[in-house]
Amino acid sequence: MKELIQLIAGYEQAKAKGQAMALATVVQVDGSAYRRPGARMLVTQEGRLTGAISGGCLEGDALRKAQTVIFQQKPMLVTYDTTDEDDQKFGIGLGCNGIIHLLIEPIDLNQADHPIELIRQALANRELALLVTIFSLKTAQSEQVGTIYLRQGNQEFGSFQKIPSDYRAAIAQEVNSFEESKNRIHCYPELGELSVFFELIPPPVRILLFGAGNDALPVAQLAEILGHELHLIDGRKALANLTRFPSASKIIKGPADEVVEQLETDLHTVALLMTHNFDYELRVLEELTTRMLPYIGILGPKRKTDKLIHRLEEKGIRVFRDALYAPI
């Protein structure tokens, strides 16, 4: 997720400078490779790279091909066969044993729904999005279709107008019934040679970090490295600030009764209770039991969590333990 955010930032910088760009996307991997389908790299006409498509082995060659795509303004499919023992042709030994198919698309700034804009839209709302990219291995030398459609909730962006009508119906049906929890590639042999990469783009994980003590500092740093969205919550104003937690996108300060009214949660939100304040966490946990969170981590010994649950049950509040992880 962090890589997609960096990709958009790199795009904005290049756009501000009026630079032409191309987007390289790993669309299919057969065998072993450093990156899986969905890995991306943005290339500018000046050769600036944002993101990565391998462990550093393919970037040089992909850069040269991307600049060709920028010049020709036509999508290109490139295949790297790292099962070939003569992998020195890519510059260094790859250390892989797979075949990587890379789609390189020009970014047309005059087009409202080009691939980067579709990705931007996917990240604009905290809702799972489905991105559709179409390519053909059988006609790899021909111009490719590319990333053309995004579905997020009831909203649609882009279209299937670039592909034959018989494909449109089949892919639309697939989109409407897509319920899988992971990416997949679908071929339609009865229709022809096209392959479709269905890619799920979830919103970044939001971490509600309760506690601004010194032990919360490395947790915040890890959240930033992983590209998570951090909300810091604490009653101690001297500790809960941007100087100590510069990566926090939101800081909520105040008594427990006040902060619980300001919590923003969804199915992609997790909570970490690290305040070292039993009464504070008791009130917080009381509120969190009413939210559909997949993970609530509680710092401290198991007996502390048992005591918290016991206090809540005495108040007639039922606590579902499936989402509780204690010790954290």
Predicted features by range, described:
Residues 1-235, 239-252, 266-270, 312:
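Segments forming oxygen-rich coordination pockets for charged ligands
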Residues 246-248, 291-292, 320:
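Short, structured coil segments at secondary-structure junctions
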Residues 301, 318-328:
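Active-site capping/gating segments
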